[in-house]
Amino acid sequence: MRYTDYLLPTLKETPSDAEVISHKLMLRAGMIRKLAAGIYNYLPFGLRSIRKVEQIVREEMDRAGAMELLMPMVVPSELWEESGRWEHYGKELLRFTDRKDASFCLGPTHEEVITDLVRNTVRSYRQLPLNLYQIQGKFRDEIRPRFGLMRGREFIMKDAYSFDIDEAGADVAYEKMYQAYRRIFERCGLKFRAVEADTGNIGGSSSHEFMVLAASGEDAIVSCGQCEYAANIEKAEVALTASDTPVAAAELARVDTPGCKSIEEVAAFLKVDKERLVKTLIVQTDAGETLAVLLRGNHELNDIKLCRLLGCNEITLAPDDVVGKVTGAAPGFAGPVDLSLRVLADFAVQGMADFVTGANAADTHYVGVNLERDFTVEQFADLRAAEAGDICPRCGGVLEIWRGIEVGHVFKLGTKYSAALGATVLDDQGQDRELFMGCYGIGVGRTVAAAIEQNHDENGIVFPMPIAPFHVLVTVVNPRQEEVLAAAENLYAELQALGVEVLLDDRDERPGSKFKDADLIGIPLRLTVGARGLKENAVELQERAGGERRMLPLAEAAALVRDMVVEACGR
């Protein structure tokens, strides 16, 4: 491809609404252009990288025995009503009616559609196992779309679905997909971790997220340096540490704490460590229940853990008026003593004695508070967010916190959807059996964005070879010099004949401008053809990663570069 024939509109300045580096660079490098909030045009240069990821995905899905199909993006509401998700999914589901007032949605995932397809086409266990996938545009009406392709409303996704006669078969399918995902992200040239994760709106028994490690990542990852344990912060377990039974030594007493609402303010006023305080959160479930949750003062609530314990979809902090009604005081002074609410507590509270809590009265706290003597807890559970320095729940090592970008997610669904939609097959005894399912997603555009987050420098993108839009950029220093242009044209043709994907920069621009664009767009290898080098029958090779430069004999350059491309792509 010739630059003069190619739509590659680079930008010198970063658009003001771009926040993270991948968004900035994808706009500046002419990969995407914004159409509306969270909705983007994929320009030729960006689409080439996306197609590279899609091809790797297809190869590994096919290798794992999955078959590609394509399902409609528009889904009738009846299927979502059957599964129960029409009411529970939330406002991210874009719903609409057609001219006949029939209800539809734009499918953010396709569990219902694929289950409906299979229940109407698969009759016998002899047709199993089955694994079907698609690569398709999807839509989620995110309340705050941001970060370009990281959190858009419209996005490209690979979603796969496995069907088995029993749980053992489903476990085999899950492991195949897990390993396929590892190969996909390794082939994309990414540094990543597979972590235990919450199943969220998809549901099911267990899941793993594939997280690209990047400082800009929205997600926190907990991992152990001594074993393989790794989990999303929402799922990360907190190990119970052995401790002596707390012994109450102080009397319960009320103390004035004027204007002290926060943990930090109370600790400073009373001259105690935050670890000696217990905070009382008044929360509400989506079912309307109001309850109290106790945490040690230096710990934070993990909403997902609490939702799992309560069996609800969402919890929120109670509004100020509700807090005032149930405690008699403003937020910041709530406490469990004489509180007429259901009380749950994190395990860490179980090991405390003589602690400080709110007194359910303005500007007042209790000191010398103790369990059982002063109040009771209905249930203790792991309710707090894991922190760096916590003990690993698997091996006793020390946990670390990383930042990551989720690019893939695999789920064991069990019979959640097959039971809801009546997807059964006849087993070898002629009995109806509900299908065991798994689902497996990859954000294709997000994978490209995550690769840029992980591979860039102050000058621009540094594409990994396997997903680079082009392998090689041939830069003509001065296309007005016939000898230089002819040599570049010949080199360009040689590379194409060898199967190398090459962009020829034949623009009549200043060399410095071309070199800046070359750094910005991040093509892995650059061959510079100029009069000075041609005097020695040589061209300059520069690797984008690291910037190493060396001269190559003109006659051998194409073959040498081809070998570098083949090695870097692992083929």
Curated annotation (Swiss-Prot):
Its main location: cytoplasm. It is found in: Cytoplasm. Its EC number is 6.1.1.15. GO terms for cellular component: cytosol. Pfam families: HGTP_anticodon, tRNA-synt_2b, tRNA_edit. InterPro entries: aa-tRNA-synt_IIb, aa-tRNA-synth_II, aa-tRNA-synth_II/BPL/LPL, Anticodon-bd, Anticodon-bd_dom_sf, Pro-tRNA-ligase_IIa, Pro-tRNA-synth_IIa_bac-type, Pro-tRNA-Synthase_IIa_type1. One of its GO terms (molecular function) is ATP binding. GO terms for biological process: prolyl-tRNA aminoacylation. Keywords: Aminoacyl-tRNA synthetase, ATP-binding, Cytoplasm, Ligase, Nucleotide-binding, Protein biosynthesis. The keyword Transmembrane helix does not apply. It catalyses: tRNA(Pro) + L-proline + ATP = L-prolyl-tRNA(Pro) + AMP + diphosphate. SUPFAM superfamilies: Class II aaRS ABD-related, Class II aaRS and biotin synthetases, YbaK/ProRS associated domain. Consists of three domains: the N-terminal catalytic domain, the editing domain and the C-terminal anticodon-binding domain. Belongs to the class-II aminoacyl-tRNA synthetase family. ProS type 1 subfamily. Catalyzes the attachment of proline to tRNA(Pro) in a two-step reaction: proline is first activated by ATP to form Pro-AMP and then transferred to the acceptor end of tRNA(Pro). As ProRS can inadvertently accommodate and process non-cognate amino acids such as alanine and cysteine, to avoid such errors it has two additional distinct editing activities against alanine. One activity is designated as 'pretransfer' editing and involves the tRNA(Pro)-independent hydrolysis of activated Ala-AMP. Homodimer. This is Proline--tRNA ligase. The lineage of its organism: Bacteria, Pseudomonadati, Thermodesulfobacteriota, Desulfuromonadia, Desulfuromonadales.
